[in-house]
């Protein structure tokens, strides 16, 4: 990693809080279709950022660059990608990362970040899994995921009531399978929590994303989305101190004063200037 060259400093009178986004209705589609980790990488690697989403996906369909075994599966992959990502705006850095060696090496956590931000059901499911793990649980089963999913109706997600029993079961299973695909869980029936570790490169990527979507640096560090990667705030700060000691970043905190110097000031810049 290149030495720190750009700075971001925030001084706050009180600790900032992560933004509470407006509630977005859950969709069963994404978790049923799956994470599509390798397929998404292949699509992103051939993506023309100057072209439209339609033109790019038409090219994927005509060339079958992902090696789909059937036209039906190819169509489903393209539809899922179209619903899940916006490559010319919020997910531009993911496309850029797919075309770098570092981005490919750490593809799973990068994709997890973008997918969970795009699909609130997946993001909330990861937070629920964190609650189970932090409460001392060492495994989780589909029945528990189904119980959690059904409980979300009391939190305002009444759309779940409209799903069939089979759809709810498929979503619950899909949530745990996605967790396993991304390395957070292991096993088939009884999914056990893994000793997950977010490497330095994707950690800095996620940090830049959190800084961009929160008003203060303190709020970025307290953002609950770090829990998708099993990184509570205290552990995150310890990781930042280690990066500071390695001179990969500059990190200073004294009460409400937080100062960060990072290798880049955005994820686009990180990928293009540091990873490339």
Segments (PLM) and residue ranges:
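Short helix-capping/hinge SLiMs at alpha-helix to coil transitions
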Residues: 133-137, 213
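DNA-recognition alpha helix
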Residues: 140-158
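Eukaryotic partner-binding/assembly regions in large regulatory complexes
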Residues: 2-131, 139-140
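Contiguous, well-ordered alpha-helical segments that form the cores/surfaces of helical PPI scaffolds
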Residues: 127-128, 147, 177
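Accessory, usually C-terminal, subdomains that scaffold auxiliary metal cofactors
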Residues: 186-267
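Long, low-complexity, charge-rich intrinsically disordered regions
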Residues: 4, 261-276
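Short amphipathic alpha-helical interaction segments
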Residues: 69-76, 163-181, 229-242
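Inter-helical turn/loop segments and adjacent helix faces that build the functional surface
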Residues: 153-166, 189
């Amino acid at each position: 990693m290149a030495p720190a060259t750009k700075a971001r400093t925030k001084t706050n009178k009180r600790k900032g809080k992560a933004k509470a986004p407006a509630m977005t209705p859950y969709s069963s589609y994404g978790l049923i279709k799956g994470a599509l980790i390798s397929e998404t990488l292949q699509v992103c690697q051939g993506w023309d950022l100057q072209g439209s989403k339609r033109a790019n996906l038409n090219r994927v369909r005509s060339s079958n660059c992902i090696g789909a075994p059937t036209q039906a599966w190819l169509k489903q992959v393209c539809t899922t990608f179209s619903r899940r990502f916006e490559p010319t705006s919020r997910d531009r850095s993911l496309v850029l990362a797919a075309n770098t060696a570092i981005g490919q090496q750490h593809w799973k956590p990068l994709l997890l970040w973008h997918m969970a931000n795009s699909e609130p059901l997946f993001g909330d499911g990861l937070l629920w899994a964190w609650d189970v793990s932090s409460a001392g649980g060492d495994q989780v089963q589909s029945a528990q995921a189904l119980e959690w999913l059904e409980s979300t109706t009391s939190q305002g997600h009444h759309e779940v009531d409209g799903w069939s029993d089979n759809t709810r079961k498929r979503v619950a299973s899909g949530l745990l399978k996605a967790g396993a695909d991304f390395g957070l869980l292991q096993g088939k029936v009884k999914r056990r929590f893994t000793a997950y570790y977010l490497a330095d490169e994707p950690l800095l990527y996620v940090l830049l994303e959190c800084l961009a979507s929160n008003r203060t640096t303190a709020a970025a560090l307290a953002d609950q989305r770090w829990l998708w990667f099993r990184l509570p705030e205290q552990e995150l700060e310890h990781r930042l101190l280690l990066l500071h000691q390695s001179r990969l970043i500059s990190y200073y905190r004294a009460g409400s004063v937080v100062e960060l110097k990072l290798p880049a000031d955005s994820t686009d810049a990180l990928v293009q200037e540091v990873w490339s």
